[in-house]
């Protein structure tokens, strides 16, 4: 467990992790502060951040199980202590870590008698099992248990539907919520005329990411939501005959790049995240793992720097160069001087 003393600056807004601990493989805890804030600001930020943490963070989970020998979800297999339904519920609890999108396949194929745990799952290369000791089933006789698993990355909670059953496969309620809980509290200080606040934010995660990583992703999602308002004055608002109705045109990535070229405002580079640049998911994930989140981050690297990124190919660099050349008429240097 890590603890740090809380020292609040009276000048510059700062955030800090004041406590961090790992209670188990599937329970991480982090406590953060943000200060100094004006009266009312802490509650505004705390409420928005808590909702973003609980509802906007993406997670990876098992969403479907397939076995040709199982006629229905409530079937009991001779030689297995648990019913099929209980096995599905155990698989629902498996915590996975992955940064890739789309559907991935995994499998389990073991022979009893033995205990079957998450360690027996054969995952795709892009997926990591957080706690390999999680129980799945108990085989009491020398029988084979072979099942196929479907893994997806999503956000929130998605319930299985009755019409979603396919030949021998059974859907599982998808719980893509890495943040188990989030709370915020406020501490006021200062005299009556200059009241200021400290925001305390507590985050519990399931181990697939750290509280600090969750805080970063929630913050980025909130920034993405507010970016259109930063450019509102640059857009035409079309009013209908009804004075109470208006339509704001959608902001595209290309529109934002055009505005940057026109206005030459370097600060705008911080407001365009690489997930808005129409890059392929694989390229985007490689950049994200290297802490390249905005165009400003990207332009701070050379071609040589990008080639050092794990799993990055020359084709990925060429694709990035094409985007920068097309929309910015600039190029990344081959190496840093």
From Swiss-Prot:
- Top-rank EC class of the record's enzyme: transferase
One GO biological process term: DNA-templated transcription
Q: How does it assemble?
A: In plastids the minimal PEP RNA polymerase catalytic core is composed of four subunits: alpha, beta, beta', and beta''. When a (nuclear-encoded) sigma factor is associated with the core the holoenzyme is formed, which can initiate transcription.
GO MF annotations, alphabetized: DNA binding; DNA-directed RNA polymerase activity; protein dimerization activity
The UniProt entry, under CDD domains, shows:
RNAP_alpha_NTD (cd06928)
**Catalytic activity line of the entry:** RNA(n) + a ribonucleoside 5'-triphosphate = RNA(n+1) + diphosphate
Positions of the UniProt region annotated as Alpha C-terminal domain (alpha-CTD): 266-337
Q: Name one GO cellular component term.
A: chloroplast
| Top-level taxon | Eukaryota
Q: Which Gene3D superfamilies match?
A: 5' to 3' exonuclease, C-terminal subdomain, DNA-directed RNA polymerase, insert domain, RNA polymerase, RBP11-like subunit
User: Keyword annotations for this protein?
Assistant: Chloroplast, DNA-directed RNA polymerase, Nucleotidyltransferase, Plastid, Transcription, Transferase
The UniProt similarity line reads:
Belongs to the RNA polymerase alpha chain family.
Q: Could you tell me what this protein does?
A: DNA-dependent RNA polymerase catalyzes the transcription of DNA into RNA using the four ribonucleoside triphosphates as substrates.
Is rRNA-binding tagged as a keyword?
no
| Subcellular localization(s) per the UniProt record | Plastid, Chloroplast
Q: What is its EC number?
A: 2.7.7.6
Q: What is its main location?
A: plastid
Q: What is known of its domains?
A: The N-terminal domain is essential for RNAP assembly and basal transcription, whereas the C-terminal domain is involved in interaction with transcriptional regulators and with upstream promoter elements.
Q: Which InterPro entries match?
A: DNA-dir_RNA_pol_insert (IPR011262), DNA-dir_RNA_pol_RpoA/D/Rpb3 (IPR011263), DNA-dir_RpoA (IPR011773), RBP11-like (IPR036603), RNAP_asu_C (IPR011260), RNApol_insert_sf (IPR036643)
- Quote the protein name from its UniProt record: DNA-directed RNA polymerase subunit alpha
Please give the residue ranges the record annotates as the region Alpha N-terminal domain (alpha-NTD).
1-233
Q: Name one Pfam family in it.
A: RNA_pol_A_CTD
């Amino acid at each position: 467990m890590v603890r740090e003393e809380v020292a609040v600056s009276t000048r510059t807004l700062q955030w800090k992790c004041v406590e961090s601990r790992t209670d188990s493989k599937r329970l991480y805890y982090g406590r953060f502060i943000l200060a100094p804030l004006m009266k009312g600001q802490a509650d505004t930020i705390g409420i928005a951040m808590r909702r973003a943490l609980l509802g906007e963070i993406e997670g990876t989970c098992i969403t479907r199980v397939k076995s040709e020998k199982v006629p229905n979800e409530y079937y009991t297999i001779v030689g297995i202590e648990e019913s099929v339904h209980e096995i599905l519920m155990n698989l629902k609890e498996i915590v996975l870590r992955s940064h890739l999108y789309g559907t991935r396949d995994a499998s389990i194929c073991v022979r009893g008698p033995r205990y079957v745990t998450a360690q027996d799952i054969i995952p795709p290369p892009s997926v990591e099992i957080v706690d390999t000791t999680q129980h799945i089933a108990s085989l009491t006789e020398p029988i084979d248990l072979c099942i196929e698993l479907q893994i997806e990355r999503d956000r929130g909670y998605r319930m299985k539907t009755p019409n979603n059953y396919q030949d021998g496969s059974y859907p599982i309620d998808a719980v893509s919520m890495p943040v188990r809980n989030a709370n915020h509290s406020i501490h006021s200080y200062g005299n009556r005329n200059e009241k200021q606040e400290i925001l305390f934010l507590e985050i519990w995660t399931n181990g697939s990411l750290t509280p600090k990583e969750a805080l970063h992703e929630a913050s980025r999602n909130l920034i993405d939501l507010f970016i259109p308002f930063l450019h509102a004055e640059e857009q035409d608002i079309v009013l209908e005959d009804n004075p109470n109705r208006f339509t704001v045109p959608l902001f595209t990535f290309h529109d934002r790049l055009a505005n940057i070229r026109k206005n030459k405002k370097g600060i705008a580079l911080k407001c365009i995240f690489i997930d808005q640049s129409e890059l392929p998911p694989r390229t985007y994930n490689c950049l994200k793992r290297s802490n390249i989140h905005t165009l400003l981050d990207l332009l701070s690297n050379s071609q040589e720097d990008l080639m050092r990124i794990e799993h990055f190919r020359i084709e990925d660099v060429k694709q990035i160069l094409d985007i920068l050349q097309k929309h910015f008429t600039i190029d990344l240097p081959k190496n840093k001087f």
